[in-house]
Amino acid sequence: WLGVGAILLAQTRSIWLGGTLALGLGLALGWRPAKNVRFVFLGGLAVAGLLALSGPVQKRLMNPANLQIRQVFWHHSFQMQAEHPLTGVGPGQWRIHFPKYGLEGMNPSVAEGVTSEVRPHNDFIWVAAEMGYVGLVLFLAFFILLIVHGVRAYRKDKAHVGHAAWMAILVLTGVYAFFEFPLERAAFWVPFMALAGWHSRGGIALPKKVYLGLAFLLLGLSGRVAWQAIQSDQTNQTVLEQNSRKDARGIVQSATDAVSSWNELDRFSNPLIYFAGMGSMFGEAQSMGQNPTFTSANFKQAEGYFNEALAVHPYHVVTLYQKANLYRYRRDYANAMATYEELLRISPRHPGGQMHYAVTLNALGNYEAAARVLIAAFLGQEYYSNPDYQRAVVEALRGMPASTRHRGLQTFIGMRSQLDDAALFQAFQTFKSQRVPKAR
């Protein structure tokens, strides 16, 4: 009954669906609750009904946004698997390859690289993407063998309630794995694997020394990996603390010390060496005082760190953004433009990327292209009040040719000679607010 309570409190569609199907299968296979618990069972159903009727739960269960995002996850996963059909992109590499196929439609924090997606919320698709047909066949074979063994056990002794319960657990696990990620949830997967071992006993006989030796070997390897994970997490936390304090030297030192063959990414999929690039760039800029002028001789070390970060994670949005900014600071506008374009191919609505791409286009004299970017940009209020954005708008509107074919921009051809910069910017923002939906 604790399990039933946990299912009710989970308030997730996959658990409720899996629990319902598992209960239905258990009843179909002959399980009947004892008389003294039937009232408790009916009470649980009543609680489930009341929860389902409550506003917050209905909003959570019926919200289509999660399903829409999952469709993006799955579509990108199928693309990964199609490019690497036999062996997949490699264990743990889904989160690296996911941005390659585009972040449009993702939450703003994901589109900006503040957070990242690390799994597709479907373990079968996840295994197929990371380990290809080979891994998927083995994963499916594992479940098929459990089902076959469970069916045989049930047929031999239909009166044994444990066999029906095990079949129901398999259904619940299968449904849950189709919409979530039990493979990465130890609280779910460890008990399930223990039950799988318990119900599968009596198979191939091995000498006691052999399976004990294998058990100790696997436990030792798991312990080694767990120890490295704990150590890595501690060093990564030091990097994040230095970064939050903006201690340039400390960031570079802690980030370079943290990198090892065991540890290249933090928990948010940021390459650790990226932080070294930020620390180096920040420190060099600080050392040059106020209003410095940067040239091609500046930020060489930071550029090297960013290149190392992109070698680890080629589609890392934040590294691409900061590398493009680095080129812009050095007035290397051609490379800045190319890098912003690479960023925006991955994350078309990246706010800083859109704004500074327009700034770069202005610097190259491509004012109409800059104006087109700005009029279509989805930005938040903090960007609209940014002086860089305001200057970019005015410069693009005043510099674009009168022959522009963009109907929206044609509106400003006549008024730009009559309005001062502040009024021209305000007119642009008014037009934009009527034309473009507000960024979420």
Describe the role of every protein-language-model region.
Residues 156-161, 195-230:
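A juxtamembrane structural motif centered on a specific transmembrane helix
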Residues 240-440:
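C-terminal luminal/periplasmic domains and tails of membrane-associated envelope-modifying transferases
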